[in-house]
Amino acid sequence: MVKKTLLTILCCILFPLCINALEGSEKLLFEKNSLYQYISVVEDSAKKERYIRNNKRDLRQGGIYLEAPDKLLFEYSRMAFVSLAFLERDPTMVLFVGLGAGSMPKYFNKYYPDAVTDIVEIDPDMVFVAKKYFNFKENEKMKIYVNDGRLFIKRTPKKYDIVFLDAYQNDYIPFHLTTFEFLKEVRSRLKEDGVVVSNILSEYNNKFFDSMVVTYRKAFPNVYVFQGQESRNFIFVATMSGKMKVQESVMADARKIQKFRRMDIDLAGIGESCEYSTAYERKTAKILTDDFAPVNLYKYQKSEAR
């Protein structure tokens, strides 16, 4: 009896079931413990939304509006496209590290159909989920590569205008995608005026956020921070250009892109939250390296005094 009870407890720990945390209007469509993470797909009939969720019910990794599947459901995904305002031309080559539900690359492909859109995703089960439950479809210009993001960047000969980094999971951060050495590899795959945009799910006052700021500042000439209003997300935009861009210029260029491309997100409004990274820098913060990157510990530790 004791062995049976212990086995039941162990199974619950190793294979957490999302269905116990569902609300009345939610329906579980899919769940699996992949080689890399727990994945569930949940549909909310009241909100008319479908999303990917891990075993913590309040954390969602990607999703769609059922009645408007081309619109971006989450604030961070809308915020990331402010990076377009830091490129002085239309992008022709972009890379997404991390697929999720596929909403961001699909959105980009809709408004820039002539650009090459590469997506690298380590988890083949996530690719399956994006295609089956979120209507993600590859096309001539948009391709998925099942690989580790860092290995792909290290080996590809391509040069990109924008690299979107969105591979940080809600409850686990792959440390090798946070370090100075990794960001140097990303730099090597950017064109001369290229841009990196990174989704950072973090509280403002913890050591992980502090270390990400100083690590990006060491790797790139200019780093800008955008803080979400609806969520805990921050967006970092790092540029190869040595010329600093002021908030008014970001807003003006964002407004032009939004109007010309007829995008359904308020890029100019997002640009209004632009701050230079020095506003967030702490002298005590540690630069993340391949030899020192305790990111999954740091995210639970409060910042030290400035």
Place the predicted regions along the sequence by residue:
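Soluble small-group transferase modules, centered on the S-adenosyl donor enzyme superfamily
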Residues: 22-51, 55-60, 222-306
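Acidic/histidine-rich helix-loop elements
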Residues: 56-70, 172
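Bacterial N-terminal signal peptides
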Residues: 8-17
